[in-house]
From Swiss-Prot:
Pfam families: Pkinase. Keywords: ATP-binding, Kinase, Nucleotide-binding, Phosphoprotein, Serine/threonine-protein kinase, Transferase. The keyword Ribonucleoprotein does not apply. It comes from the Eukaryota. It comes from Saccharomyces cerevisiae (strain ATCC 204508 / S288c). This is Serine/threonine-protein kinase MPS1. Its EC number is 2.7.12.2. InterPro entries: Kinase-like_dom_sf, Mps1, Mps1_cat, Prot_kinase_dom, Protein_kinase_ATP_BS, Ser/Thr_kinase_AS. The lineage of its organism: Eukaryota, Fungi, Dikarya, Ascomycota, Saccharomycotina. Residues 85-95, 272-292, 306-315 have a biased composition (Low complexity). Residues 201-216 have a biased composition (Basic and acidic residues). ATP binds at L446, G447, R448, G449, G450, S451, S452, R453, V454, K468. Residues 66-95, 197-216, 258-316 are annotated as: Disordered. The active site is at D563 (proton acceptor). Residues 440-720 form the Protein kinase domain.
C-alpha cells in the first residue's frame, strides 16, 4: 500500500467514524428516544475494530518499508548498512510506534532508531544518498503518525462526548408511540447496528463477542440499582458494563412506553365517555355514533394490551346503557344503568389517577396532562348530570323538554335602622374628615390626651391646619358646657396674636371638631432637645418673656387658663402662642378666683391652692362648697414659675417626687422648694433669676408677682452698664462723700433714686 493510498484510507475512515459519532445527522423519520447503552456498546466495539484495522494497516506499511530497505541494500551492499533497519524488524508490529500508540490511549514519546552499530563514511557519496533516504523515510513515518494521532484524538473527543451525554433527547408525541415500533427493543440483537465488515479479525475481538453471546442478562432485575451499582453488587467484570447498561435503559424505555400507553388509554376513555354522554337527546344520533365508534376502533393504531384496550368497550357499553335507559322508563333513578356505569367510570378514574401519580415524574408533560384530565373530569360530570336530568324528564313525558320555573322566594319585610346624618362625618376614605362641608385630609397624629386627639391635616389649597377631635358623652351636660365654654373663649380671643386662632368648628352627636392653626413645635419639644446642653440664660430669658406675654393676653381678657404647661405653648411661624382652653373659664368681675368641683391641671405644674380644700362655712346649705377647688390668676403664675424652674434646673420643683407623694409634697408647707446657686453642671445662676423664681413660687397666692411685675423684673430687664460708667460712678460717689462727711438718710435715699433713674436708661 502506497503512502497516498494510506492517507486516503485514513481520511475515509475518519470521516466515517465522525459521521457515526456526529449529532448533526439528518432525520428522515420522527426523532427517537436516546439509548445511552446502545451508544456505549457500539462505541466500544467500533473502537476495538478500528484499533485492529489500524494495527494491520500499520504492519503492512512497516513491512513495505522493510522490503524497500532490503532491496536497496541488496542493490548497494555497503558493509556498514547491515543493521540499518534492525531496530524495526527485530520486534513485532505491536512494539512499533503504531502499536504502542494504539494500545495506550495516549500519544507516547517518539521512538528513535538504534544506530549504534551503523558506521558512517562521510567521504562516500553513496552513504549520503542512503542517509537522505533514511531521513526521508523517518520524516514520512513521523508525518503519518502525527496526522493519525490528530484524527484519532478528534474521534476520541467526539465519541467520548456521545457516550457520556448521548444524543439529544427529543419530545415524542403519543401518535409516534403508536404508529411505529420503538427501536432497539429488548428482543432486538445487540449487534444489529454493526454493519462494518472487518478484513482482519483479532483474537481479542473474537473473545469479546463470544463473551457477549455466552452471557445471558435477559432475566436481570435491577430494582433500585443502576448498572454500576449492579456490577459492584454481583462482582461482575467491568467489560460487561455496556451490555448491562443497554439492558437497563431498554427496560426503562419499555416502562416509559407502557406508562404512556396507560395514560393515553385513560384520556381516550374520558373523551369517549364525554362524547357519549352528550348525545342523549336523539336515538338516531346514538346509532350513528355507534357506527362511527366501530369505524374508529378499526382504524386505531396497533398497541399492546393495557387499560386503553378496554376504553372502546367501556364507551360502547355506556352508549348501549344510555339507549336502554331511554327506552325503559320504569327503572328507578338511582338503580339505572347510567348510574351504575358512572360509578364504574369513577372507580376506573380513581385507579387511573393513582397510576398517574406514580408516573408523574416520568412524563415530560405531566402538569399539562393533569390539567387537561381535570377539565375532562369536570365536563364528564356536567354531561352525566345533564343526562340524568333529561332521563328523568323523558321517563315522565318525552314531549316536555323545559323545566318548571322555581317558585318565587317569600316576601320578607325588612326593618332598617336609619341613623341621623352627621354634619361632620368621616367619608369613605378613612383619611378624610369633613367639617361643615369642607374636607380635610389627615397627615399625622400630633398628640392625644384623654378623649381628644389632635391631627395635622391638609385642607383646600394644600394649607396645613390642626384638627382637634373630641369625643364626649352626648348626655353629659357638664362636658357639653365645658366645650361650649372653650369655643366661646377662643371666639373672644380671636383677634389676639398670642392665642391660637380658631378657624372653624362643628359639634355633632358625641363629637366635636375644631379647626385651628397648626404649630411647628411646642415648648416641651424645644426643652427636650436642649437637655444636656450648656445652660444659656439668653434662651431662658427669651422664652420666659414670650410665655409671659401669652399669659398677659389671657389675664387681661379676664380668663384663667388653669392648665399651663410647656406643651400648651406652640410656635406658629416663629411666634409663641398659647393653646388648649379646655378647662379654662372666665373669672367673674367681682372676684379674682373661680371654683371647680373637679381637680384640674397637670400635677407637676399645679398650685397648692388648687389642691387644698377650702374652709367651708358653717352654713349647712353651703357645706357642699368644701369640696370645691380654688383657682385664680395666681395659680397661672405658679405654673409659670414651675416652667422657668424647669428651664434652669432641668426639672419641675417637685419633679423628684413620684405619684401621690408629689401631690402631698405640693400641699405640705413644710416641704420647701430648693433654689441652689449652681446647677448640676456647676453653672452659676444669677441672683435675679433666683429672685424671679421665688417671686412666682410663693405658697401664699397674695404674695406672688403678677404678670406685669414679672415682665419688669431685673432678670428680664437687666442693666447694661459699661466699665467707663462704673468708673465714673465710683469717682463721683467718693468725691461726694469727701465733700459731705455727714449726710442724712433722706439725702442718701435721694442719691440712690437718682442713680437708679439714670440706670433705667441702660436697661435692655
Amino acid at each position: 500500500m502506497s503512502t497516498n493510498s494510506f492517507h486516503d484510507y485514513v481520511d475515509l475512515k475518519s470521516r466515517t467514524n465522525t459521521r457515526q459519532f456526529s449529532d448533526d445527522e439528518e432525520f428522515t423519520t420522527p426523532p427517537k428516544l436516546s439509548n445511552f447503552g446502545s451508544a456505549l456498546l457500539s462505541h466500544t466495539e467500533k473502537t476495538s475494530a478500528s484499533e485492529i484495522l489500524s494495527s494491520h494497516n500499520n504492519d503492512k506499511i512497516a513491512n513495505r518499508l522493510e522490503e524497500m530497505d532490503r532491496s536497496s541494500s541488496r542493490s548497494h551492499p555497503p558493509p556498514s548498512m547491515g543493521n540499518l533497519t534492525s531496530g524495526h524488524t527485530s520486534t513485532s508490529s505491536h512494539s512499533t510506534l503504531f502499536g504502542r500508540y494504539l494500545r495506550n490511549n495516549h500519544q507516547t514519546s517518539m521512538t528513535t532508531m538504534n544506530t549504534s552499530d551503523i558506521e558512517i563514511n562521510v567521504g562516500n557519496s553513496l552513504d549520503k544518498s542512503f542517509e537522505r533516504i533514511r531521513n526521508l523515510r523517518q520524516n514520512m513515518k513521523e508525518d503519518i503518525t502525527a496526522k493519525y494521532a490528530e484524527r484519532r484524538s478528534k474521534r476520541f473527543l467526539i465519541s467520548n462526548r456521545t457516550t457520556k451525554l448521548g444524543p439529544a433527547k427529543r419530545a415524542m408525541t403519543l401518535t409516534n408511540i403508536f404508529d411505529e415500533d420503538v427501536p432497539n427493543s429488548p428482543n432486538q440483537p445487540i449487534n444489529a447496528r454493526e454493519t462494518v465488515e472487518l478484513p482482519l479479525e483479532d483474537s481479542h475481538q473474537t473473545n469479546f463477542k463470544e463473551t457477549k453471546r455466552n452471557t445471558d442478562y435477559d432475566s436481570i432485575d435491577f430494582g433500585d440499582l443502576n448498572p454500576i451499582q449492579y456490577i459492584k453488587k454481583h462482582n461482575l467484570p467491568t467489560s460487561d458494563l455496556p451490555l448491562i447498561s443497554q439492558i437497563y435503559f431498554d427496560k426503562q424505555r419499555e416502562e416509559n412506553r407502557q406508562a404512556a400507553l396507560r395514560k393515553h388509554s385513560s384520556r381516550e376513555l374520558l373523551y369517549k365517555s364525554r362524547s357519549s354522554s352528550s348525545s342523549l337527546s336523539s336515538n338516531n344520533l346514538l346509532a350513528n355514533k355507534d357506527n362511527s365508534i366501530t369505524s374508529n376502533n378499526g382504524s386505531q393504531p396497533r398497541r399492546k394490551v393495557s387499560t386503553g384496550s378496554s376504553s372502546s368497550k367501556s364507551s360502547i357499553e355506556i352508549r348501549r346503557a344510555l339507549k336502554e335507559n331511554i327506552d325503559t322508563s320504569n327503572n328507578s333513578n338511582f338503580n339505572s344503568p347510567i348510574h351504575k356505569i358512572y360509578k364504574g367510570i369513577s372507580r376506573n378514574k380513581d385507579s387511573d389517577s393513582e397510576k398517574r401519580e406514580v408516573l408523574r415524574n416520568i412524563s415530560i408533560n405531566a402538569n399539562h396532562a393533569d390539567n387537561l384530565l381535570q377539565q375532562e373530569n369536570k365536563r364528564l360530570k356536567r354531561s352525566l348530570d345533564d343526562a340524568i336530568t333529561n332521563e328523568n324528564i323523558n321517563s315522565k313525558n318525552l314531549e316536555v323538554f323545559y323545566h318548571r320555573p322555581a317558585p318565587k322566594p317569600p316576601v320578607t319585610k325588612k326593618v332598617e335602622i336609619v341613623e341621623p346624618a352627621k354634619s361632620a362625618s368621616l367619608s369613605n376614605n378613612r383619611n378624610i374628615i369633613t367639617v361643615n362641608d369642607s374636607q380635610y385630609e389627615k397627615i399625622e397624629l400630633l398628640g392625644r390626651g384623654g378623649s381628644s386627639r389632635v391631627y395635622k391635616v391638609k385642607g383646600s389649597g394644600n394649607r396645613v391646619y390642626a384638627l382637634k377631635r373630641v369625643s364626649f358623652d352626648a348626655f353629659d351636660d357638664s362636658s357639653i358646657d365645658g366645650f361650649k365654654g372653650e369655643i366661646e373663649l377662643l371666639e373672644k380671643l380671636k383677634d389676639q396674636k398670642r392665642v391660637i386662632q380658631l378657624l372653624d368648628y362643628e359639634m355633632g352627636d358625641g363629637l366635636l371638631y375644631l379647626i385651628m392653626e397648626c404649630g411647628d413645635h411646642d415648648l416641651s419639644q424645644i426643652l427636650n432637645q436642649r437637655s444636656g446642653m450648656p445652660l444659656d440664660f439668653n434662651f431662658v430669658r427669651f422664652y420666659t418673656k414670650e410665655m409671659l406675654l401669652c399669659i398677659k393676653v389671657v389675664h387681661d381678657a379676664g380668663i384663667v387658663h388653669s392648665d399651663l404647661k410647656p406643651a400648651n405653648f406652640v410656635l406658629v411661624k416663629g411666634i409663641l402662642k398659647i393653646i388648649d382652653f379646655g378647662i379654662a373659664n372666665a373669672v367673674p368681675e367681682h372676684t379674682v378666683n373661680i371654683y371647680r368641683e373637679t381637680q384640674i391641671g397637670t400635677p407637676n405644674y399645679m398650685a397648692p391652692e388648687a389642691l387644698v380644700a377650702m374652709n367651708y362655712t358653717q352654713n349647712s346649705e353651703n357645706q357642699h362648697e368644701g369640696n370645691k377647688w380654688k383657682v385664680g390668676r395666681p395659680s397661672d403664675m405658679w405654673s409659670c414659675g414651675c416652667i422657668i424652674y424647669q428651664m434652669i434646673y432641668g426639672k419641675p420643683p417637685y419633679g423628684s417626687f413620684q405619684g401621690q407623694n408629689r401631690l402631698l409634697a405640693i400641699m405640705n408647707p413644710d416641704v420647701k422648694i430648693p433654689f441652689p446657686e449652681h446647677t448640676s453642671n456647676n453653672e452659676k445662676i444669677p441672683k435675679s433669676a433666683i429672685e424671679l423664681m421665688k417671686a412666682c413660687l410663693y405658697r401664699n397666692p397674695d404674695k406672688r408677682w403678677t404678670v406685669d411685675k414679672v415682665l419688669s423684673s431685673t432678670f428680664l430687664q437687666p442693666f447694661m452698664i459699661s466699665g467707663s460708667i462704673m468708673e465714673d460712678l465710683i469717682r463721683n460717689a467718693v468725691r461726694y462723700g469727701s465733700e459731705k462727711p455727714h449726710i442724712s438718710q433722706d439725702d442718701l435715699n435721694d442719691v440712690v433714686d437718682t442713680v437708679l433713674r439714670k440706670f433705667a436708661d441702660y436697661k435692655i
